[in-house]
Curated annotation (Swiss-Prot):
Family assignment from sequence similarity: Belongs to the ABC transporter superfamily. Phosphate importer (TC 3.A.1.7) family.
Chief localization: membrane
PANTHER family given in the database record: ABC TRANSPORTER I FAMILY MEMBER 17
GO molecular function term, any single one: ATPase-coupled phosphate ion transmembrane transporter activity
Annotated coiled-coil segments of the chain: none
Protein name: Phosphate import ATP-binding protein PstB
Job of this protein: Part of the ABC transporter complex PstSACB involved in phosphate import. Responsible for energy coupling to the transport system.
Top-level taxonomy: Bacteria, Pseudomonadati, Pseudomonadota, Gammaproteobacteria, Oceanospirillales
UniProt keyword Nucleotide-binding present: yes
Gene Ontology terms: cellular component: plasma membrane
Length: 297
């Protein structure tokens, strides 16, 4: 369980030249190519795990997300793609209320995890974040041992009555994260002493240790080398057998490799969502095609 101080904050820095350039390119594109009246493709599924309708996000008076509606299916891997500043990470953080940590942020719309209203005032947000876990862009292991990083959540949520039970949860989580064989003989070593790729897999183990239903990943490989990235991508495929996964990525190649459906965001709007192969080989909207062919972004 991450504290507010340990969370990566959304990119709100207007001095970020690359981000500003990407936003300006998006504005220029929409001057020539208007948004569709509604999202192109197939953003909805039967019997969704998460049902999201007319989602809007504001930072004070600045609207970051404009009326996004989509479904995420059970045990589906969905990729959210788009240029810097398009709102994909902001949208992802709505799904387990990480945006609550930002005082000026306000979320509107209907967001449900099956029948549960995610923004019900009576909802225990800590419990929600156990059901909908998050893996961040930069690995953020706690300053604790490898064992205690994974055991932290189960202890907080009372998932283990005995040390034997806790040991089993830790081992199972590390195995699912593909890390057990690498750390089983040094479980009490600091988690911060692992390599970057190992740290990210430790964070994934920490997330799944509380048995979430959904795992959100915000650019989980952006700070990793190609070998570590390949391990995370293989892990995503394996985890999808047990969990529903939504991943934000700047890498279109990664989206193509790991996801069954892909959603393209542009200046806070969902332009197109469809099965991944269709989005990348036969995009239906000109803005999507312009992005995936490298004309901007």
């Amino acid at each position: 369980m991450e504290t507010a101080q340990q969370l990566d904050k959304p990119a709100l820095d207007t001095n970020d030249a690359a981000r500003d350039k990407a936003i300006n390119e998006q504005v220029t594109m929409t001057q020539d190519t208007p948004y569709p009246d509604q999202t192109v493709g197939n953003p909805f599924v039967d019997d969704p795990k998460m049902r999201l309708r007319d989602v809007e996000v504001f930072y004070d008076d600045n609207q970051a997300i404009h009326g996004v509606s989509l479904d995420i299916g059970k045990n589906e891997v969905v990729s959210l793609i788009g240029p810097s500043g398009c709102g994909k990470s902001t949208f992802l953080r709505c799904l387990n209320r990480m945006n609550d940590t930002i005082d000026i942020c306000k979320v509107k719309g209907s967001l449900h995890l099956e029948s549960q209203d995610l923004y019900d005032p009576k909802l225990d947000v800590v419990e929600l974040r156990a059901r909908v876990g998050m893996v961040f862009q930069k690995p953020n292991p706690f300053p604790k041992s490898i064992y205690d990083n994974v055991a932290y959540g189960p202890r907080i949520h009372g998932l283990a009555n005995k040390k034997y039970d806790l040991d089993e949860i830790v081992e199972t989580s590390l195995r699912k994260a593909g890390l057990w064989e690498e750390v089983k003989d040094r479980l009490h070593a600091p988690g911060t002493g692992l390599s970057g790729g190992q740290q990210q897999r430790l964070c994934i183990a920490r997330t799944i240790a509380v048995s979430p239903e959904v795992v959100l990943m915000d650019e989980p490989c952006s700070a990793l080398d190609p070998i570590a990235t390949a391990k995370i991508e293989e892990l995503i495929s394996e985890l999808s057998e047990s969990y529903t996964i939504a991943i934000v990525t700047h890498s279109m190649q990664q989206a193509a490799r790991v996801s069954s459906r892909t959603a393209y965001f542009h200046l806070g709007r969902l332009v197109e969502m469809n099965d991944t192969e269709t989005v990348f080989t036969k995009p239906e909207h000109d803005l999507t095609e312009a992005y995936i062919t490298g004309r901007f972004g």
